[in-house]
From Swiss-Prot:
Annotated site residue numbers, Interaction with sigma-70: 241, 250
Function: Activates expression of the rhaBAD and rhaT operons.
InterPro entries: AraC-bd, AraC_XylS_family_regulators, Homeodomain-like_sf, HTH-like, HTH_AraC, HTH_AraC-typ_CS, RhaR_RhaS-like_N, RmlC-like_jellyroll
Any one GO cellular component localisation term in the record: cytoplasm
Annotated protein name in UniProt: HTH-type transcriptional activator RhaS
Annotated gene: rhaS
Residue stretches making up the HTH araC/xylS-type domain: 174-272
Annotated PANTHER family: HTH-TYPE TRANSCRIPTIONAL ACTIVATOR RHAS, HTH-TYPE TRANSCRIPTIONAL ACTIVATOR RHAS-RELATED
GO MF: DNA-binding transcription factor activity; sequence-specific DNA binding
Entry keyword Repeat: yes
GO terms (BP aspect): positive regulation of DNA-templated transcription; rhamnose metabolic process
Keywords recorded for this protein, A-Z: Activator, Cytoplasm, DNA-binding, Repeat, Rhamnose metabolism, Transcription, Transcription regulation
Native source organism of the sequence: Escherichia coli (strain SMS-3-5 / SECEC)
Length: 278
């Protein structure tokens, strides 16, 4: 597995923060780093396989990657990321207690993926741009300024994540997308789902298309197919069982959609013919 080293990304040995844009981010094999990072998805779509679990990522997704996590990107479509790198929560010169603002693992579950709305993403970009402007300066005031900006970024993300802000339709759409990650195999009635998240059906269609480039049903089908592909690679269940477990009532229809999406049949994936990035 590829290991990325801080010496290749941080501008100096005492720099606590570095900015690494990926515009765009191509498919990239599984790797880990000797530093931490906050991955901010600017726009586009892709699959982020994080510690073996696939997540659909779109504009507004924020992922917190620790130095022992392994991850990869695949099936990317104009996926543009900004990575905010930091050595460790306890390796800042002027900041302490940052762990309290970061996601915490509870009962073996690590809430690695958050979502923010478009207006918050604009504020995030401004903070990151300010950090980039000062990246070449190594004096104490510049170091302190970068670390303060990093703290502001963490505060903004925490306050604005879907877990704490459901006041507008964009935030409710983010919550809906997170709900679909957990309920992709359910029979989805879009009228009922729109009501559940206090959105009109028209608003749901318009905003989801703006954010993902897909209609709601197309997005759900892709999500189901991504989950199915993961199971084909990492479980012994039959193709038919996987189709049913991922929300498809007809395995033949599932196979047709699968081949259309990935240009490989489920059997091809099961046998590793697609040359899956390891």
């Amino acid at each position: 597995m590829t290991v990325l080293h801080s010496v290749d990304f941080f501008p100096s040995g005492n720099a606590s923060v570095a900015i690494e844009p990926r515009l765009p981010q191509a498919d990239f094999p599984e790797h880990h780093h000797d530093f931490h990072e906050i991955v901010i998805v600017e726009h586009g779509t892709g699959i982020h396989v994080f510690n073996g679990q696939p997540y659909t990522i779109t504009g507004g997704t924020v992922c917190f990657v620790r130095d022992h996590d392994r991850h990869l990107y695949e099936h990317t479509d104009n996926l543009c990321l900004t990575n905010v790198l930091y050595r460790s929560p306890d390796r800042f010169q002027f900041l302490a207690g940052l762990n309290q603002l970061l996601p915490q693992e509870q009962d073996g579950q690590y809430p690695s993926h958050w979502r923010v709305n478009h207006s918050v993403l604009q504020q995030v970009r401004q903070l990151v741009a300010q950090m980039e402007q000062q990246e070449e300066e190594n004096d104490l005031p510049s170091t302190a300024s970068r670390e303060i900006l990093f703290m502001q970024l963490l505060l903004l993300l925490r306050k604005s994540s879907l877990q704490e802000n459901l006041e507008n339709s964009a935030s409710r759409l983010n919550l809906l997308l997170a709900w679909l990650e957990d309920h992709f195999a359910d029979e989805v009635n879009w009228d009922a789902v729109a009501d559940q998240f206090s959105l009109s059906l028209r608003t749901l269609h318009r905003q989801l298309k703006q954010q993902t480039g897909l209609t709601p049903q197309r997005y759900l089908n892709r999500l189901r197919l991504m989950k199915a592909r993961h199971l084909l690679r990492h479980s012994e269940a039959s193709v038919t069982d996987i189709a049913y477990r991922c929300g498809f009532s007809d395995s033949n229809h599932f196979s047709t959609l699968f081949r259309r999406e990935f240009n490989w049949s489920p059997r091809d994936i099961r046998q590793g013919r697609d040359g899956f990035l390891q």
